Amino acid sequence: MNVLISNDDGYLAEGIAILARVASEFANVRVVAPERDRSGVSNSLTLDRPLQLKQAQNGFCYVNGTPTDCIHVGQFALPDFKPDVVFSGINRGANMGDDTLYSGTVAAATEAYLMGMPAVAFSLNDASGRYWATAEKALWTLLAHFFKKPPSAPVLWNVNIPAVAPEDVRGIKITRLGRRHHEQNIVPSRNPRGEQIYWIGPVGEVSDREEGTDFGECGAGFITVTPLQIDLTAYPDMAETAAFWHTD
């Protein structure tokens, strides 16, 4: 089985090295990742300039584009390699709740799903670098189970690994997405020339960490797996929307 691996932290990130190393024990792996950190770019594509595919000394390939670009390149530009499955990650930091809308890690998996492949995004609920051992041990468990009977149809799964010691991981839970409050206000500043500039403020606090949510269960020490879908239609609002837009 051929597995394409990407991320949004860039090809030099520790998380993608761990993911590639573990996945290589189960499948034929190729890595195509951004040349630099592209966190928060969501599903964006590079349409205003050409892309370049280069190979690093460690064998990983990198692209001067976004995570979504990398999936396109990995699918259509690698000689003698056609992916059956796509893994994205391991992201340095969680991707839970509405964060998934902004995440390049999740976006790479989403693009693969749209192309008709099973896809899994992996994230570690920690940005300090203290819990990579937990992430690696969790991956062995997750991928051993995955490759026993790989999905035969496209799936899109978002996995978050808790920031606890390896022995303190409590198991796996299937969850729904939680929610955050709206992000905080932008932060005004001045550049060295005295010109007004702005920084996007920090993310908002979690507003929904109830039992059964990714925020709640991952925070309680569980590996969370959340099945995602592409259809954003608000089906319960169809009738109300039709009534609002009804004209005689």
UniProtKB/Swiss-Prot annotation:
GO molecular function list: 3'-nucleotidase activity; 5'-nucleotidase activity; exopolyphosphatase activity; metal ion binding; nucleotide binding
Species for this entry: Neisseria gonorrhoeae (strain NCCP11945)
UniProt-listed Enzyme Commission number(s): 3.1.3.5
Cofactor entry: a divalent metal cation
Reaction(s) catalysed by this chain's protein: a ribonucleoside 5'-phosphate + H2O = a ribonucleoside + phosphate
Cofactor note: Binds 1 divalent metal cation per subunit.
Function: Nucleotidase that shows phosphatase activity on nucleoside 5'-monophosphates.
PANTHER family assigned to the protein according to its UniProt record, in alphabetical order: 5'-NUCLEOTIDASE SURE, 5'_3'-NUCLEOTIDASE SURE
Entry keyword set: Cytoplasm, Hydrolase, Metal-binding, Nucleotide-binding
Name the UniProt record assigns to this protein: 5'-nucleotidase SurE
Primary subcellular site in the record, as a coarse category: cytoplasm
Domain of life: Bacteria
Similarity comment: Belongs to the SurE nucleotidase family.
Localization (cell): Cytoplasm
Pfam families documented for this protein: SurE (PF01975)
Gene Ontology cellular-component terms listed: cytoplasm
Binding site for a divalent metal cation: 8-9, 39, 91
Stored InterPro entries: SurE (IPR030048), SurE-like_Pase/nucleotidase (IPR002828), SurE-like_sf (IPR036523)
Source organism phylogeny: Bacteria, Pseudomonadati, Pseudomonadota, Betaproteobacteria, Neisseriales
